[in-house]
Amino acid sequence: MRNLKRALSLLLSSTLVLGMMVMGGSAAGYQDVDDSNVHQEAIEVLQAVGIMTGKENGDFDPDGSITRNEMAVVMAHLLNLDYDYYRGTHPFTDVPDWAAPYVAACAAEGVVAGIGNGQYGGDQKVTAAQASLMLMKALGYFQNQEDFGTDWQVATIRQASYINLFDNINSNAESALTRAQVAQLVLNALESDMVSFTGDKGIQIGNVTVGYKAEYTAKTGTDKKYNTLVSGKTDISNQGQYYIQLGEELYEGQLRKADDADAFDRPAYTWSYKGEKIGTYVDWTQMVKEYTTAVTGKELYNLLTSNTIKEYGFHYYVDGKESTTIK
């Protein structure tokens, strides 16, 4: 187990949020990714399944950027595309040989598109909007041009935000994503429901589509492999139907996320792939105590217990003023 950081932060203003900043145990990863990296879980899961790997020197380079060419590689590995089959088939004029099979495969599958004038723009850094659109298409969204309305970025960001694709990612639509953020985005997609188009494609009158209505419905299935990722809704009214998440479909139930507890008996979950443990990670959504009214020092003392207070250091803020004393 990695060195444990003994820190616990409290934040108080109109509300108070409490969480112990100690990560759960995980398998060996990269030398530049440790407990302090909020994307450690995503990076290690994607390493285990072979979607994103590190540099030759053993680093993951979490803060490094990722290009559109490299994002095509990520998508090809994510979707297990036979990229060699598509070698030499892409329609773009600016794709280097090393990236050509991946870009070609993704273009053939409708996952990526060019930037105009026969160019793919592969050397450009991939933005949050671009990367999320690729992943949304993998989930089943935006299969028709009409889905975008008048602005593809607005439509993409709106729908991606609605399904929580940007959880744990601090970025805006046109910002270049870091490698760590891309890893988080992909992991979020793996835990998202796949969908089918159930809207109305309308009728074509000249160059105009009339009556088009974009609607998507979550896919369901009865196979137990569709109940291997724990991330909210799974069973539909006890009818044996499970919402199909991307990671369940792609990995045939071999990628698993199960409720667990860490070494401190805190609520956590453990990831595994093909029966091999990837790591155990604290479920931070349950490591929160929120107060919407005034809270006394005694209440905090009773919540934390005297042993915890003796063992850990505390910092909390009341209306912006820092204190470390709990009485």
Description of each model-found segment:
Residues R2-Q40, T53-N69, M75-P101, A108-A129, ...:
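Feature responds to low-complexity, polar/acidic, surface-exposed segments characteristic
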Residues K277-K327:
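Structural detector for short beta-strands of small beta-barrel domains
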